[in-house]
Design a protein with these regions (language model features):
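Conserved short alpha-helical segments that host acidic/polar catalytic motifs at enzyme active sites
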Residues: 1-210
Length: 210
């Protein structure tokens, strides 16, 4: 099973995310990664292999920030490679997400999105969700002239996920809303925690304890 963890607060998000991913190792996985808001961008670091290998990557090529998401992947679509590891990026980088579950209609959605000009860099079903959310966000901005607000981000996730067939749990970052994580689920577990000036999301309560 895949593992998801997310954090908004005042601590170094990378430290919390890595600790959370270690606590989710019991679920089984073949790769791991994190995405953190860092100097105005969403910085993604990911590796095929164990969380300890991701630890070493962060030690040498770390990112500092107080908002981020993390993931451990057990491959169901696509090989076990660095590029297929989560998090995945949608559109032109405006959406970054992690996903637990299976997108049963990913082939048809991939074809539709490729027709619209979206370029796929992985062989995963998850990248379909990232591009789909980005598409609805871009369409909303073009149609309404609306900037990327919290409300808009929530609504485009809702719109995109209605087109997904299968089970899912997702945690989504938006480049232009650096204080927001949108989480959604259907059939895959997610838990939410609220602390003093901190907010958490995870596949189970393990990363939230302590």
């Amino acid at each position: 099973m895949c593992g998801i963890v997310g954090y908004i607060g005042f601590r170094n998000a990378s430290d919390f995310l890595l600790d959370g991913l270690h606590r989710l190792e019991y679920r089984g996985y073949d790769s791991a990664g994190i995405a953190v808001f860092h100097k105005g961008e969403v910085a993604v670091r990911k590796r095929a292999g164990r969380v300890c290998e991701l630890d070493r990557l962060i030690e040498t090529d770390g990112v500092e920030g107080t908002v981020g998401i993390g993931h451990t992947r057990w491959a169901t679509h696509g090989e076990t490679t660095d590029v297929n590891s989560h998090p995945h990026v949608g559109g032109n980088g405006e959406v970054v997400l992690v996903h637990n579950g299976v997108v049963e209609n990913h082939n048809s959605l991939r074809t539709q999105l490729q027709t619209l000009g979206y370029v796929f860099r992985t062989t995963t079903d998850t990248e379909v969700i990232a591009h789909l959310i980005a598409h609805h966000l871009e369409k909303r901005i073009e149609t309404d002239g609306e900037i990327c607000t919290h409300e808009a981000c929530v609504e485009v996730v809702e719109t995109a996920m209605r087109k997904i067939e299968g089970t899912y749990g997702v945690a989504v970052l938006f480049r232009d809303c650096p204080d927001l994580i949108v989480a959604a689920r259907a059939g895959s577990p997610l838990v939410v925690g609220i602390g003093r000036g901190e907010y958490f999301v995870a596949s189970d309560a393990g990363p939230l304890v302590g």
